[in-house]
């Protein structure tokens, strides 16, 4: 899995990059055929936003989450992606 992390109006610190890498590596337990991940971390006034696009075998998955701080937004994003990956995996098993 290749991670591409970018920031808009926020500096990506090494600690934040390590946190994102650790969280996204846990997604492989839900679906092991994740090819590329594009992550955009944004700050808009008081809201922290985390967006992700996953290129997986059989399609693409997109999710977005907001939080009071960036780490909470990333945690929410991981929860959404885990649900979507489980649903995608079940859909592929049915065919």
From Swiss-Prot:
InterPro entries, per database record: HPF/YfiA_ribosome-assoc, RHF-like, RHF/RaiA
GO molecular function (one): ribosomal small subunit binding
Annotated Pfam families: Ribosomal_S30AE (PF02482)
SUPFAM superfamilies for the chain: Ribosome binding protein Y (YfiA homologue)
Keywords in alphabetical order: Translation regulation
Gene Ontology CC terms: cytosolic small ribosomal subunit
Family: Belongs to the HPF/YfiA ribosome-associated protein family. Short HPF subfamily.
Complexes and interactors: Associates exclusively with 100S ribosomes, which are dimers of 70S ribosomes.
Name of the protein: Ribosome hibernation promoting factor
Record organism: Klebsiella oxytoca
